[in-house]
Amino acid sequence: MEIRSFKEKDRENCRDICHKTATAPAYVKSKDLVCLLYCDYYLDNEPDNCFVLADDEDNAIGYILSAEDQWAYTKAMKPYLKKAGRISFSEKIMHQLASLAEKGVTKKYPAHLHIDILPEGQRKGYGTKLLEALEGHLRAKGVKGVRLGVGGDNKGAHSFYEANGYVLLRNFGAFGRVYGKELLP
């Protein structure tokens, strides 16, 4: 297994990983929907901020995707949200609320990330290695900090991020948590 930069040949594997690791019913039903919201933007617009966990045949079985600037991401994401028009009204509201809630932390933590790994790559230290690869990359680009959202009931993920130096920034109970990590003073 190897951590490496995203290559265009990884695109469909990354989209498959995004869909296979989705848990919300609407996302499980629609690969296009979950990928529009959580994968395609990063691969299309910020591929240099994307890293994959590749198996011995060089196939992506995990990834970490990042947008280094929340404001640029918010503007560029509009066409993706428009394409995702099938998303239910309540899910759109929740997405907007999460975005608004994060505005208070974007100055200190301007980047955000998504990380997903298929079961065969989990619990082997690769999640930490993906975080380290992205954090080093963002640090070298002068990015001050990075944050992420995680489900409120995902206690394993809470422990994982805390063990990797992420601090709880916002707790929305069952709706989720926002964690962040400073990369530069």
Task: Mark where each language-model region is.
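Conserved GNAT acetyl-CoA-binding A-motif
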Residues: 108-111, 138-151
